[in-house]
């Protein structure tokens, strides 16, 4: 009887555990679906991070232990940890193929890393509590964080005093975030002297010193201390060199199947890179391949205090160096840079915390192509950065011949076949090539090509009542890239920057993209008997609109809206469809 009672209690206990586990999994999935705004984003996130979780019902009593173990063996992060750690303790290579002696070989589950460089100034206890919760949430979402401490603000003439300060701050961090020996949700360990410097170049001595804690679910905190082999002494290492050294060690030591660097995060009290266009609040998104040099120049004319300007320049340069290096070595643009403040990182709402939101969606909280002059566009202190894609822009300012489509084809600046293939793919229809090129050939205003024809835009000059108006004729993104974070924003920002005064475009009334267009225009209109919705924007609408046809309408600073709408309607309704 006692044995039966024991089995009964165990069965009830297993049911309760099963319920808790099932509820936790359900809540995780619901929170992911709630925080992602589209099905594509939710699918992309779950595809990338699915092996970081065990969504299998491993408490199914109808399965034998053997079957359960075979199904779960080494197919998710938790089930690989013990194997790797035991190998390391036995002084063997922890990361050789996990099925060396088996016929079936499974791909290793990579660690999804986020490297945090935290500037240790002006962070309140309340903010630390919020930051700790953010780290817990990131771990729940499948991210393995690494923390680097930034003490660049300290004077470099006294190692002893700085070391005492760093030890004190490190102990505070352990108290804020949790000790590895404690039974808490968050465990951290403090590491120092992981690097050796030779001729000014830091190298990581032991990659396992970082990876083993990560596989144990512990966040490693790295102190910026390096052993100088040339001078045989310990010294401090600048945070930018430490970040690049750590990133290169993780990428270079043949660990691409073991880990991926998903995020490079800088936590700095001054926040993201300031933008003149956004009235010194932060750039929302930076495509380094296209914008790096322009933004660097902008920082020196943006009326920023020199000490803050220099910090922003350092942050931008460091991000550019690290992301460029990772991009070159990995061959992809998966790594995202984030610069934000401690206050913002401490926010514990997925949709408002830009780090958590970026893990879920791989984009910024708001779109970078939203007009900064409208009240509905919030101002942020966070910048999202990608190495990004190369951009080619052709207009009268950078082309010394007559700007015609045929000339661009003849000079091999635009690949005709690739452009037509892109348009066909993007719109899902066949372009009526001959008539279309004949119509736009001599009316080209701007042509934008992104990447290897990953996206493109064609702007033409159209005429009405003796005036020429910029018309967005084609805005195309390859189907494989539709939904790719930032690509549409990159192209649309270039379009608006190329024609800031006045721009119009049309879209079919049933086009699901119309909501996206509406958020980026000054206004739109459509006739009841027309299939088109017409959008317009530009600085011309910063002027006063005269709706009552007063005599003032011909004065400078006033736009005759009736005349404008008639022009727009005449142009957009008069252009024949370009697809068969």
Curated annotation (Swiss-Prot):
Pathway: Amino-acid biosynthesis; L-arginine biosynthesis; N(2)-acetyl-L-ornithine from L-glutamate: step 1/4. GO terms for cellular component: mitochondrial matrix. Its EC number is 2.3.1.1. Disulfide bonds: none annotated. Induction: Up-regulated in cells treated with farnesol and grown at high cell density in N-acetyl-D-glucosamine medium. Expression is regulated by the general amino acid control response transcription factor GCN4. One of its GO terms (molecular function) is L-glutamate N-acetyltransferase activity. GO terms for biological process: L-arginine biosynthetic process; ornithine biosynthetic process. InterPro entries: GlcNAc_Synth_fun (IPR011190), Vertebrate-like_GNAT_dom (IPR006855). It catalyses: L-glutamate + acetyl-CoA = N-acetyl-L-glutamate + CoA + H(+). Keywords: Acyltransferase, Amino-acid biosynthesis, Mitochondrion, Transferase, Transit peptide. Residues 403-560 form the N-acetyltransferase domain. It is found in: Mitochondrion. PANTHER family: AMINO-ACID ACETYLTRANSFERASE, MITOCHONDRIAL, N-ACETYLGLUTAMATE SYNTHASE. Belongs to the acetyltransferase family. N-acetylglutamate synthase involved in arginine biosynthesis. This is Amino-acid acetyltransferase, mitochondrial. The gene is ARG2.
């Amino acid at each position: 009887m006692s044995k039966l009672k024991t089995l009964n209690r165990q069965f009830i206990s297993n049911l309760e555990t099963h319920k808790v586990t099932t509820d936790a999994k359900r809540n995780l999935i619901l929170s992911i679906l709630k925080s992602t705004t589209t099905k594509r984003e939710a699918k992309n996130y779950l595809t990338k991070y699915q092996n970081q979780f065990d969504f299998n019902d491993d408490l199914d009593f109808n399965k034998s232990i053997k079957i359960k173990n075979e199904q779960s063996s080494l197919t998710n992060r938790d089930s690989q940890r013990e194997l790797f750690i035991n190998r390391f303790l036995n002084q063997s290579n922890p990361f050789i193929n996990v099925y060396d002696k088996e016929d079936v070989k499974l791909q290793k589950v990579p660690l999804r890393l986020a490297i945090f460089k935290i500037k240790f100034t002006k962070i309140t206890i309340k903010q630390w509590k919020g930051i700790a919760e953010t780290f817990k949430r990131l771990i729940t979402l499948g991210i393995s964080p690494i923390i680097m401490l930034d003490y660049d603000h300290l004077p470099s003439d006294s190692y002893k005093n700085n070391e005492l300060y760093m030890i004190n701050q490190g102990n505070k961090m352990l108290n804020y975030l949790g000790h590895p020996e404690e039974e808490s949700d968050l465990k951290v360990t403090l590491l120092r002297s992981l690097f050796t410097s030779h001729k000014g170049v830091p190298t990581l001595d032991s990659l396992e010193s970082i990876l083993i804690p990560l596989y144990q679910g512990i966040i490693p905190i790295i102190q910026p201390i390096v052993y100088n082999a040339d001078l045989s002494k310990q010294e401090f290492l600048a945070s930018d060199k430490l970040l690049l050294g750590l990133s290169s060690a993780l990428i270079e030591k043949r660990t691409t199947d073991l880990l991926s660097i998903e995020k490079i995060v800088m936590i700095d009290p001054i926040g993201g890179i300031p933008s003149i266009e956004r009235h010194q609040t932060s750039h929302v998104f930076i495509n380094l391949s296209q914008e790096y040099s322009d933004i660097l120049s902008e920082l020196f004319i943006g009326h920023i205090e020199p000490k803050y300007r220099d910090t922003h320049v350092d942050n931008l340069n460091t991000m550019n160096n690290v992301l460029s290096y990772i991009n070159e070595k990995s061959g992809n643009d998966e790594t995202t840079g984030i610069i934000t403040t401690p206050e913002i990182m401490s926010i514990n709402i997925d949709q408002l915390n830009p780090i958590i939101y970026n893990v879920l969606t791989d984009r910024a909280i708001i779109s970078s192509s939203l007009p900064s002059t409208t009240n509905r566009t919030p101002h942020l202190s966070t910048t999202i950065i990608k190495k990004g894609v190369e951009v080619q822009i052709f207009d009268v300012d950078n082309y010394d011949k007559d700007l015609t489509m045929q000339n661009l084809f003849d000079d091999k600046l635009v690949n005709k076949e690739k452009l037509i293939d892109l348009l066909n793919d993007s719109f899902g229809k066949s372009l009526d090539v001959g008539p279309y090129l004949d119509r736009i050939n001599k009316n080209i205003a701007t042509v934008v090509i992104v990447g290897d024809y990953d996206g493109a835009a064609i702007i033409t000059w159209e005429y009405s009542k003796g005036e020429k108006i910029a018309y967005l004729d084609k805005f195309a993104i390859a189907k494989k890239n539709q939904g790719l974070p930032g690509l549409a924003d990159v192209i649309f920002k270039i379009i608006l920057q190329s024609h800031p005064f006045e721009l119009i475009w049309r879209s079919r009334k049933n086009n699901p993209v119309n909501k996206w267009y509406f958020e980026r225009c000054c206004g739109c209109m459509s006739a009841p008997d027309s299939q088109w919705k017409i959008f317009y924007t530009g600085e011309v609408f910063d002027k006063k609109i005269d709706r009552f046809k007063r005599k003032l309408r011909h004065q400078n600073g006033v736009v005759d809206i009736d005349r404008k709408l008639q022009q727009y309607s005449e142009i957009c309704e008069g252009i024949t469809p370009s697809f068969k």
